């Protein structure tokens, strides 16, 4: 792609990793801090545990070429419940992330990770937000309070209008006017004219010259 910088590639092409790529390429590099050649600009390193999708959607814009589906990518910690390393905390605001299924990811006949498909629900009903949560088998992915995961949050195929409006909430943040500051080069106002002296000094009229003539 002549004339196109590597870091600009993901601004023109949709970030859509396969399951194998998610756990064998992206997640290991996110854990080690290696560069992702531009894709890291689209992956937000933020703790999303306890956050509702609408709040995340208002804060982070969807990835380029994925505005209609609302794709947002996160590198985060899936926190474990207190006293358990198996069950994960799924409550988020007034709703809950419900695990729909867990699938093993294999490459060349060997398990390399797994993906959990989740749906965000309120009062038992789907809101139209879904997420794929990818986990690898690297030991460094396990931390003291949970497991480091790579997530893709997006709209379901038949998401209701309410969810689609939530996905576009980031536009309101972008449209906020910038604070207006006075120009440092603004012309200074001239100082006010000095007030007239109410008691000006008296000017005496010129004195007449007296010439004496002496007669002899």
Place the predicted regions along the sequence by residue:
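Structural scaffold elements adjacent to functional motifs in cytosolic proteins
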Residues: 1-126, 143-144
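Terminal low-complexity, poorly structured segments
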Residues: 23, 131, 198-202
